[in-house]
Design a protein with these regions (language model features):
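Non-catalytic interaction/Regulatory regions outside core domains
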Residues: 1-130
Length: 130
């Protein structure tokens, strides 16, 4: 996985013991599964996400990447992907969205911005600016 220095803070390679519990109430994981780094859907998804790192930061998104099916990570066992999968996890640790194809950052932001916890965050940010 080739990442720029700026994007390294947002993209994390899944290890065998990577656990979603580590992100509950602090970040919104987007889990990207593919059978290979060469998967065209995987490549497109990483490009889409890399286009607007600020949008990822504003929404507390961390992107967890697993392109090794033989790894049998905790995430693979829990989420059971088939080939490419885009899975959005809320800050509460629950699956909010599961897609078999890439999503652009605008679509992702729209879904997240409708979530109750995100609405509270945006309200709080507005109050702080006053």
């Amino acid at each position: 996985l080739q990442l720029t220095r700026a994007s390294e803070n947002y993209f994390v390679e899944v290890k065998k013991n990577t656990n979603l519990e580590n992100f509950v109430w602090t970040q919104r994981p987007i889990v990207i599964f593919a059978n290979s780094e060469k998967d065209p859907n995987f490549i497109s998804q990483i490009e889409f996400l890399s286009e607007d790192l600020q949008a990822l930061e504003e929404r507390d998104i961390v992107v967890l990447v697993d392109t090794n099916p033989s790894n049998s990570s905790l995430l693979r066992k829990r989420l059971r992907p088939h080939g490419f999968a885009f899975i959005l996890i809320g800050k509460d640790g629950q699956v909010k969205l599961r897609k078999p194809s890439p999503w652009n950052i605008r679509e992702i932001a729209r879904v997240i911005d409708k979530m109750p916890i995100r609405q509270q965050e945006m309200d709080r940010q507005k109050q702080e600016k006053k």
